[in-house]
Each structure stands twice: as structure tokens, then as C-alpha cells.
């Protein structure tokens, strides 16, 4: 009979095999590596907390774990991330039933997103000395792109004829088209001619030629924010928030904004309704509108 440290070693090996299964199943379901790692880390925390053989797990165990985290002060968004990992583990890896009534998702306590004024957008871009990152930030704002989407763009994804951008590396695994701003295209064209005329990866790492990681643009954005004297809480996703909010200010219907942002659920887009909605008058990137700052 195993006791003490021997039992811990046995349990560690047992858990490791299940953690590896998360990776295998995740790859088969075409999950992104970052999502798989998040699931693995969350499930590891859960298994350490419950200390039971995975085959013996129940929904009550998951509920106890999430309640424990809730009582520790974790936010609803964190609880829902843990919930999503456990749902995947139970249903896809263990083949167990999941009871949404017993283990419901937390009601999100959404905060109003940080939105830059149009003047602040101009200040940020003016303070970005590196032309590659200036083009990246211009695309993120003018087209509402996530940082992961813009760094995975390829030359052929940019349609100058239709003034559209094809997004194939989206968070929701759903391809979509985003609008292409003329001003952003002008900046992008300048970058392209002055920075090696890349024909594959649009923003390659200058040393490896591979895709950039998100850390580079985030660091450059922080530097530009400091140089421009802008509030220090501005981060990369604020550019996407600003795109959506400025479109709402310009009267674009929220259903079209949902499509442009690639949101599966309208609830994800409704967070921008703190600004009054108007009638659809035609979709043009807010980046092509200079002056007349309506947001401060």
C-alpha cells in the first residue's frame, strides 16, 4: 500500500497523463496553443485542490472549487475562464456529463472599457517612431483588430481593391473580413516600401523572419503612451475598444460592429452601448475622420 510521499508521486504521474490528454484533445479540436496551456494550468489547479482521481470527479467538485475561488475574491471573468477549462476537461477529456444548473457561469461584472479619444489616437501614433509598430497600431484601431490577429496577417490578406482585410487567425476560430482604412493603408504602404517589402508574413520578426509575438507590440505601445504623456492604463486592446466606440458615435448599427469585431454573441458587443446608438449611415473607419473629436 502506498503512503505519504509515494502516494504523492503516484498521483503526480496520474494527473500528468490527464493534463497531457488535454493537449491531445485540444489539438484535435484545433484549439490554439495558448488556450490549451490555459486549460492545462486551470485543470492542474483544480486537481490539486480536489485531490481525487479524475475518474471519480463530480460536478459538485467543480462547484466547490469555483466557490472557493469566488470566496477568495476572484472576478467573474476569472471564474468563467476556470469554468470553461473544467467544462472542456469533464466533457471532452473525461467523457463526463456537465450540469450547467449546478455549476453555472458567473454573471460578468463588465467594466466600461478604456476608450481613447480621436485626438489621443493621433498623439499615440505620432509618438510611435518605429514604422512597423505604427502600422500595427493604425490597423488595430482603424479595423478593430486584436493584437493576435494583426501580428498574424500576411501580405495576401490585404485587399487594396476591396479595401478589406481577411482575418484568419481569430480568437473565435471564425474567419471574417475587416474594413481597411485609407489612412491605415497609406501608413502600411510606407512601412512596406521602407521595411523590406515583405511578401509573406506582413510583420515578420526582423531576426527570425517568423511571426512577431504579442510582447513586442505591447512594449512599443507602452513606450509610445509614455512619450505621448497619455494615461498609463492604456493597453493594446484599448485600440479595439476605441474603434467600436467611435463607430457607435458615428451612427453605425451595433449588429454591424459585432460582425466587424468578430463577436459570436451580441452580448460581447453590447458593452459599448454606454454611448447612444443611432441609425446605420454607412461604415467608414473612424481613422479616416480627422478632427471633430466627439469623445473628449
Residue positions per predicted region:
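Conserved catalytic core of the tyrosine transesterase superfamily
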Residues: 10-296
